[in-house]
Amino acid sequence: MIDVMDKHFQEELHLSLAQSAWVQFAHYLGYFLMALPAGWLATKLGYRGGIIAGLLMVAVGGLWFIPATQIAQFWAFLLGVCLIAAGLTFLEAVANPYTTVLGAPDFAATRINLAAACNGIGWIFGPIAGAMFFYSTDASGKSTGAETLWMPYAGVAVVVLLMVLVFAKAPMPDLKAEETLPAEAAGIPGNPASTHSMAGFLLWLNLVVLSVSLGMIACAIATIFSEALFLPVLSGTTALFLLVFSLVLLLQRKKMRLESIWSRPHFSGATLAQFFYVAAQSGIFAYFINYMTTQPPVPVGNATASTLASVGFACFLAGRVIGAGVVKKFSAHMVLGVYGAVNVLLCACVMLRLGWASTVCVFLAYFFMSIMFPTIFALGISGLGDGAKKAASFLVMAIMGGAIMPKLMGHIADSSNVSLSFIVPLCCFLCVAAYGFFWSKLGGSPKSMAVISESKI
């Protein structure tokens, strides 16, 4: 439902496409801020406690939309979005690694894809609820979405509170990742120095991404006073953080121990791939309605476009279900690479504005991006043993990509058109494809699903 709110806020609050992207920023900011605390609490509370904590926070966020509708200010809605995302962070950081250790290690990617497929049910019905409550009209044709926006979120809060009772009573085994291989076995074959060098380079790239993310947070504060401050604050803050982080990395590079999860290139590469995947996904989801109301040969209305988003998410769900079988038959990292390459071509077709063919490509992009998040997650924590919980927190933090790229897409769409803005997800999918194709070169091993015990970050 969050992604279909953008068009609603554009019209009700008179926002540009780039300004409405603060919805995605608030959503993924919640993930970014809570990822590490969620991972830390998960180690203290266990799987059950972490899941219950996440569900309670989601319920609080959903109920906040009731007073937010009365306040009727953009910041109030953004706060509710951020609270829900913070709760979801607990679920991502706890439930995903829990899924990977519930069965045979070789099928971890398959299990996590099947579990994630359940999300598709919510994705399908979410846009339908959005069409009913965000874009509803009265008998005279006047929009009533401003008064009814809180209803679906309150409904979600009630359901989530019922789930809290279920998890509080249901038996849940507290499993741990097996440690089947010595730490040295998870490295890249060949010169250990080259492995260390690759790990250091990928860690530096992660610091670049982190610097941009912190720059965006500074921008969120600065643009409260003036939208014109966006680019100066972003560039200045990013450069400052990158300089500081680079100096720290340079001084501490010799202290990167073999036991650190950051010494594993396949993990540090996964955080980058996850950043770019979520960036691409968030941008496509956020501007789907804008695309459907302006770009096809026969544009549709807001409510119809919101309903069509359900078709896109149905494609997403189908991709998850089919993809779970595909990654079971073929190497998960190669499937990820191929799917990423296909989405590069699909985004290129959208940019070329080929009429209905481009519109179909948007729906196909939903299908082929479907397996990326859980597959990157499973590949990233492969071989990390008990370090998987900490690694999961960083992989969830990488979701911050979804807060940054929609702003860039929005600026391109405002200055040109929505079709051209698909160059942003195109570049992101290139990065995902590269990670998939080169995963084994980064030290990933299908036979190694749990290696590092009590890793030090």
Describe the predicted segments one by one.
Residues 2-3, 202-235, 260-310:
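Extracytoplasmic gate region of multi-pass secondary transporters
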Residues 22-40, 310-322, 401:
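Central cavity-lining transmembrane alpha-helices of secondary-active solute carriers
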Residues 33-75:
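Conserved MFS/SLC helix-loop-helix module at the cytosolic interface between two early adjacent transmembrane helices
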Residues 33-47, 319-332, 413:
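Helix-to-loop junctions at the C-terminal end of transmembrane segments
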Residues 56-71, 341-354, 437:
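C-terminal ends and interior cores of transmembrane alpha-helices
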Residues 90-104, 288, 370-385:
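Intracellular juxtamembrane helix-capping segments at the cytosolic ends
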Residues 107-135, 393-405:
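Glycine-rich segments within core transmembrane alpha-helices of 12-TM secondary carriers
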Residues 130-135, 157-190, 199-225, 237-253, ...:
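C-terminal membrane-cytosol helix-exit motif in multi-pass small-molecule transporters
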